């Protein structure tokens, strides 16, 4: 059997039709997801019940035949495994107990202690490795340290990550220690996902764009480099996708600086610019505006084709610039796939 298309792209091969998957492809836009989510009772129960987490991971594969399935979990399971309280408020999102001092960082569990909490996630990966179609690539993931830290410091998502920036300004050494602890735990977490059957892993740095200058180097580039180097040492041949969202011009050179096999792009950068400045270093992933899966129409088709064409001279995985939204029309996803695959 020939190698899976996404693995070929991640090795630098240019394919006539780009492989495709979507961030948050298992999500509320799908009626079957909503039914399974109701069966679970709450979001965390869905994440920690392997049969149900595997089921929602498989649903978009059955419906659309995406080239990859991404593990259904949440980036905030890791801080919970490090000892923080985690709960979800209906209509508002996640809440965490907070880490705002050197003492708070010191009180976190060591990286080696995360696996008891996260063992259901690894079981989900094992189920998926058995049940996915043979041609479908299984992607594991974690939040990148900066993004995870923003939630651990603020106790919730914030529009400007101000609490994390304040902690960083007040006690840079303590904040760096927090980043180090998350980095160590992320290495062990992704390594365990790979051991359970993940064929690719992705680092989501959703708030990388709020880091500037030296901070971007210290808290986005360097942790990613450490994580990728450690994973490559433990698991040679396992590709890593990095997503420093809203990095803008810093997308250029990110693969070289971190060792990532692929850089995922948000839709704030033009595909033509990224093809010239980012794709020269290897595979790129992206970058359709998810809002087009809500509005649909000819603009969805033409923009999908434009992105495919822009990246056609090098290795490319088609994806969105951010996660698909609950308001997206499932029929528009089918239209997008038709525009890509013909």
UniProtKB/Swiss-Prot annotation:
The keyword Isomerase does not apply. One of its GO terms (biological process) is protoporphyrinogen IX biosynthetic process from glutamate. It is found in: Cytoplasm. It is an enzyme of class 4 (lyase). The record marks 74 as: Transition state stabilizer. Keywords: Cytoplasm, Decarboxylase, Lyase, Porphyrin biosynthesis. Substrate binds at residues 24-28, 74, 151, 206, 322. Pathway: Porphyrin-containing compound metabolism; protoporphyrin-IX biosynthesis; coproporphyrinogen-III from 5-aminolevulinate: step 4/4. Its main location: cytoplasm. Its EC number is 4.1.1.37. It holds the Pfam family URO-D. It catalyses: uroporphyrinogen III + 4 H(+) = coproporphyrinogen III + 4 CO2. One of its GO terms (molecular function) is uroporphyrinogen decarboxylase activity. GO terms for cellular component: cytosol. Homodimer. Belongs to the uroporphyrinogen decarboxylase family. PANTHER family: METHYLTETRAHYDROFOLATE:HOMOCYSTEINE METHYLTRANSFERASE RELATED (PTHR21091), UROPORPHYRINOGEN DECARBOXYLASE (PTHR21091:SF169). Catalyzes the decarboxylation of four acetate groups of uroporphyrinogen-III to yield coproporphyrinogen-III. NCBIfam families: hemE (TIGR01464). This is Uroporphyrinogen decarboxylase.
């Amino acid at each position: 059997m020939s190698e899976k298309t996404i693995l070929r792209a991640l090795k630098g091969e240019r394919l006539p039709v780009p492989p495709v998957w979507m961030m948050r492809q298992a999500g509320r836009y799908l009626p079957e997801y909503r039914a399974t989510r109701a069966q679970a009772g709450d979001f965390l129960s869905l994440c920690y019940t392997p049969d149900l987490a595997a089921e929602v991971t498989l649903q978009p594969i059955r419906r659309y035949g995406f080239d990859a399935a991404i593990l259904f979990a949440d980036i905030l399971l890791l801080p919970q495994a490090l000892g923080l309280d985690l709960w979800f408020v209906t209509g508002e999102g996640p809440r965490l107990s907070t880490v705002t001092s050197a003492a708070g960082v010191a009180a976190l569990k060591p990286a080696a202690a995360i696996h008891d909490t996260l063992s259901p996630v690894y079981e989900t990966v094992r189920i998926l490795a058995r049940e996915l179609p043979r041609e479908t690539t299984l992607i594991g993931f974690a939040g990148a340290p900066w993004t995870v830290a923003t939630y651990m410091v603020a106790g919730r998502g914030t529009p400007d990550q101000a609490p994390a920036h304040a902690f960083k300004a007040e006690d840079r050494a303590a904040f760096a220690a927090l980043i180090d602890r998350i980095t160590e735990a992320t290495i062990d977490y992704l390594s365990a996902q790979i051991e359970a059957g993940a064929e690719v892993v992705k680092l989501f740095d959703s708030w990388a764009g709020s880091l500037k200058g030296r901070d971007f180097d210290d808290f986005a580039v360097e942790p990613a480099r450490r994580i990728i180097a450690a994973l490559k040492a433990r698991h040679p041949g396992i590709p890593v996708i990095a997503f420093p969202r809203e990095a803008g011009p810093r997308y250029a050179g990110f693969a070289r600086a971190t060792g990532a096999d692929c850089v995922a792009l948000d839709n704030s950068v033009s595909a033509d610019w990224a093809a010239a400045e980012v794709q020269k270093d290897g595979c790129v992933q992206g970058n359709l505006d998810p809002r087009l899966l809500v509005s649909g129409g000819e603009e969805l088709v033409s923009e999908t084709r434009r992105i495919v064409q822009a990246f056609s001279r090098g290795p490319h995985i088609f994806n969105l610039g951010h996660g698909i939204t609950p308001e997206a029309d499932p029929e528009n996803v089918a239209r997008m796939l038709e525009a890509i695959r013909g």
